């Protein structure tokens, strides 16, 4: 079952929750990065939050280059989850705790996602662990949410370790179990690492990537 209907519904509920509770669209700190998601004026030189809404991509994002580089077939849901929309990260509440689903802010962000996905999968191979790919963070970034690439199930994963706790048999069921979390925008700190320049995804990964790559 594709995760796209569940993602479509969550995005609709997400924005409706903000409109109902706050009377406004969700806001996000783009940190100078443009996006078709931005509603209203945008000034790259101003450090301010912008209102945003998801925009469906005209052409689906593809991970064929990642598959070719790693000689690995990725679970097809990766194209539905990351390739359909431009969007800010999506905050959620769940029975497993609070967290966020990662999304792609613009094309540069998508390129960074691919680069860091390659890094993650290479690390898994180096550690002789089964391949996974990340979809989000749980508990303020202390835990990764990852997909088992062999069957599409959703797991909690700590950097450098094999996932031990399965949350859902599929990404569609996992997204369907989430509720939008209403919160003010938070400005993330920039990391002093070139691969993490784009805030749409990788500011959210600051603790994870420091743990994963900072000690090599």
Curated annotation (Swiss-Prot):
Location (main, coarse): membrane
Cell compartment(s), UniProt: Cell inner membrane
Annotated keywords: Cell inner membrane, Cell membrane, Membrane
One Pfam family of this chain: Syd
GO terms under cellular component: cytoplasmic side of plasma membrane
Gene3D superfamilies per record: Syd protein (3.40.1580.20)
Topology of this chain in the membrane: Peripheral membrane protein
Disulfide bonds, paired cysteine numbers: none
HAMAP family: Syd (MF_01104)
Family to which the UniProt record says this protein belongs: Belongs to the Syd family.
Function per UniProt: Interacts with the SecY protein in vivo. May bind preferentially to an uncomplexed state of SecY, thus functioning either as a chelating agent for excess SecY in the cell or as a regulatory factor that negatively controls the translocase function.
Protein name: Protein Syd
Record gene name: syd
